[in-house]
Structure formats: structure tokens, C-alpha cells
């Protein structure tokens, strides 16, 4: 039985195994507190995320189970990886991942990025997305604060808690507004991996400009700002809108012409502007894919087709439509944790 140590962080009890020391708070999210720590086993710094009360409701239980399954399945250099997981005596769940020193949001607010850093960061984002999308996973909440970076400029995408299967009947507002694809705002029901390409395009533009491209005050203002630059959405895109209210709103907007991005980004590399034009397209089906973007001339210094892997198998989303009680989710979660630790579940009492 592992020995647990208790610590108070921001008034929250952290119960961690004695393997981890030097707890320091690094961030607070909607679903948990994140601390940095030192792993005594490896000597490496790690991030420990406490999922608060994961078994309090079926919705929270399912969300935690989904995040755990995704962290276990996704294995790629540009995606955050799980190094340990445990349940404390108080029945909180702790995910342990590698610790990277900063994130893109902090970098962007501290200083302008030079061209080679912009290229290298965008390359790694798209390399990670190519893999994630090949696994049948959509991130849905890609933004600078979800993109971690270390001192070697290695980049990893994190926070897959909102990620969901590529299927119709998608739920509405999930990603931070500035980076949200128009089809999430307009269609509500059906969207696919292209939403991540839009978000990556917004992040790319922010790296080029040093400020958010579409800083909407609310979703109405957000959509209006997008049309000021990209023009009115094409009629075939408007016809995909499911909500009557949304349709009326879009049709009420003044007709606008697209402004060439070369006018907006006057000092940018023309190849960068060309790639951005292909990422920020209203019609998701005409948006460039991650694999296609990697082969674009702007990323030629880093592009290596032999080292841009796809997933070995699709992620199994069969659990995602299940409407199960907390106790069932708990048993499934325990089973996943035992599997992660390579424990024979027939021999081990929970």
C-alpha cells in the first residue's frame, strides 16, 4: 500500500504518494488544481493535477474517465503524456504528467516571437494535431494556454478533457471564444477535426501579430469581428445552420467582402500569410488539414514526412454515449488505473 502525504494548497487538500515532493501550485482550472512537484523515482519535475470530487456526479465521473482514457491512448511527442495516476484515500484522482516550464499564452504576453520560433511552434502544433486527428479525436479547446513549451522550445498540447469523438450531435460552446471555429458558433450540431485547424490558425495569427486576431466580447461580437476580416460566410455554409435564431442573426448582418490577409499582416512572410489563408476558411470542408499544412512551404525547414506519425489505432469512443451511474464509472476508472499500472485485476482487491 502506497504511503500518502497531505498538504494544503490554496485551501485544498492534496493527498499524494511519498514519491512526490516539493509541491508548488501552478494553476487552477474549472475541474482541478495543478501543482508542480519533484518525482523522487526519476528525479524529474512533474505536474500533478487533482481532479476534485470526480465521483460526485455521473457527468464529472464520465468526464474524468474520458480524460484518463485519452491520456492513456494518445502517445506522441507533441501531446502531453501520463507518467502516473492514483486515487487518494479521500477518493480524489491525481493525474501526473511531465512538467514543461511555460505555455504559449505566457510567451505571447511577454515578448514578440521571432520567425523561426513561430514556424517551429506552429509545426509542432500541427504535427500533434495530425496524430490526434488520425486517432479520431478532436481537441475542441485549443488555445495558447493549452500549449505547453519547455526551455528547448519543445511543445506539447494538453487538456484533452473536452476532447470528443468525431460524431454529429456535438454540444455547443466549448472552446475559449477567441479561438472558436465559426461552425461551433453557427451549427451547434455537427463539426469535426477542422475546428482545431481554425483554432491553430487563430494561434498562428496571434504569434505573428502579438495579439488575438478575433477578440470578441461575446459570441455575437465574435462572429461579427470574423466577418469584418473574412467577409460574409458563403450561402452553402449559412444553409448548414440548425438554429432558427442563429440563422436570422447571420442573415441580418451586413454583407461584407473578404479582406486579403496580406493587408492585415503587411510585415509577415508571404508564405505564412498563404498558410493562414488556408487555415481560416469559413467552410470547414475547404479548410486545410493538419497533414496538408505540414507539407506547406512555410513549414519546409521542419517538415519531415518520415517523422510525422499517425495513431496506430483509432480511439475507442464506445463509452461516450453511455449514461451510467457513478458507481459504474468508478469501477471502470479503477479498472483503467489498474491496467495502467499493469496490475492483474483478478488478483488485486480495489
Curated annotation (Swiss-Prot):
**What enzyme category does the UniProt record give?**
transferase
Question: Which keywords does the record carry?
Answer: ATP-binding, Cytoplasm, Kinase, Magnesium, Nucleotide-binding, Nucleus, Serine/threonine-protein kinase, Transferase, Virulence
Q: Which CDD domains match?
A: STKc_Sty1_Hog1
The Protein kinase domain extends over 20-299
Q: According to its UniProt record, which cofactors does this protein need?
A: Mg(2+)
Any single GO BP term: stress-activated MAPK cascade
Q: Which one Pfam family would you cite for this protein?
A: Pkinase
Query: Where would you find this protein in the cell?
Result: Cytoplasm; Nucleus
Q: Which GO terms describe its molecular function?
A: ATP binding; MAP kinase activity; protein serine kinase activity
Q: Which residues are the active-site ones? A: 141 (proton acceptor)
Q: List the disulfide bonds.
A: none
Tell me what reaction this enzyme catalyses. L-seryl-[protein] + ATP = O-phospho-L-seryl-[protein] + ADP + H(+); L-threonyl-[protein] + ATP = O-phospho-L-threonyl-[protein] + ADP + H(+)
Q: Does the keyword ATP-binding apply?
A: yes
Q: Which family does it belong to?
A: Belongs to the protein kinase superfamily. Ser/Thr protein kinase family. MAP kinase subfamily. HOG1 sub-subfamily.
Purpose of the protein: Proline-directed serine/threonine-protein kinase involved in a signal transduction pathway that is activated by changes in the osmolarity of the extracellular environment. Controls osmotic regulation of transcription of target genes. Involved in environmental stress response. Via the downstream MSN2 transcription factor, may play roles in the regulation of growth, conidiation, trap development, fatty acid metabolism and secondary metabolites biosynthesis.
Domain topic, free-text comment: The TXY motif contains the threonine and tyrosine residues whose phosphorylation activates the MAP kinases.
Q: Mind telling me what this protein is named?
A: Mitogen-activated protein kinase HOG1
Query: Which organism is this entry from?
Result: Arthrobotrys oligospora (strain ATCC 24927 / CBS 115.81 / DSM 1491)
Organism lineage reads as:
Eukaryota, Fungi, Dikarya, Ascomycota, Pezizomycotina
Amino acid at each position: 500500500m502506497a504511503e500518502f502525504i497531505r498538504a494544503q494548497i490554496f485551501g485544498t487538500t492534496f493527498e499524494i504518494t511519498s514519491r512526490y515532493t516539493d509541491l508548488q501550485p501552478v494553476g487552477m482550472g474549472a475541474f482541478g488544481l495543478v501543482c508542480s512537484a519533484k518525482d523522487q523515482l526519476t528525479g524529474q519535475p512533474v505536474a500533478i493535477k487533482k481532479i476534485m470530487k470526480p465521483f460526485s456526479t455521473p457527468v464529472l465521473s464520465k468526464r474524468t474517465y474520458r480524460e484518463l482514457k485519452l491520456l492513456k491512448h494518445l502517445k506522441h511527442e507533441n501531446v502531453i503524456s501520463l507518467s502516473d495516476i492514483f486515487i487518494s484515500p479521500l477518493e480524489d484522482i491525481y493525474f501526473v504528467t511531465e512538467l514543461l516550464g511555460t505555455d504559449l499564452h505566457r510567451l505571447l504576453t511577454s515578448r514578440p516571437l521571432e520567425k523561426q520560433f513561430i514556424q517551429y511552434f506552429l509545426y509542432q502544433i500541427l504535427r500533434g494535431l495530425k496524430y490526434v486527428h488520425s486517432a479520431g479525436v478532436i481537441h475542441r479547446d485549443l488555445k495558447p494556454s493549452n500549449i505547453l513549451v519547455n526551455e528547448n522550445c519543445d511543445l506539447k498540447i494538453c487538456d484533452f478533457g473536452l476532447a470528443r469523438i468525431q460524431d454529429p450531435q456535438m454540444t455547443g460552446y466549448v472552446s475559449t471564444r477567441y479561438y472558436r471555429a465559426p461552425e461551433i458558433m453557427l451549427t451547434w450540431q455537427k463539426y469535426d477535426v477542422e475546428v482545431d485547424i481554425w483554432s491553430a490558425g487563430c494561434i498562428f495569427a496571434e504569434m505573428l501579430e502579438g495579439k488575438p486576431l478575433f477578440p470578441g466580447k461575446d459570441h455575437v461580437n465574435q462572429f461579427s469581428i470574423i466577418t469584418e476580416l473574412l467577409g460574409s460566410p458563403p450561402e452553402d455554409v449559412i444553409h448548414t445552420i440548425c438554429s432558427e435564431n442563429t440563422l436570422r442573426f447571420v442573415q441580418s448582418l451586413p454583407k461584407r467582402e473578404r479582406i486579403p490577409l496580406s493587408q492585415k499582416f503587411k510585415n509577415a512572410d508571404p508564405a505564412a500569410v498563404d498558410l493562414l489563408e488556408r487555415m481560416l476558411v469559413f467552410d470547414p470542408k475547404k479548410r486545410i488539414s493538419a497533414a496538408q499544412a505540414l507539407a506547406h512551404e512555410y513549414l519546409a525547414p521542419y517538415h519531415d514526412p518520415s517523422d510525422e506519425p499517425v495513431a496506430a489505432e483509432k480511439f475507442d469512443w464506445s463509452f461516450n454515449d453511455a449514461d451510467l451511474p457513478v458507481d459504474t464509472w468508478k469501477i471502470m476508472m479503477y479498472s483503467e488505473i489498474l491496467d495502467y499500472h499493469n496490475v492483474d485485476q483478478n488478483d488485486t482487491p480495489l
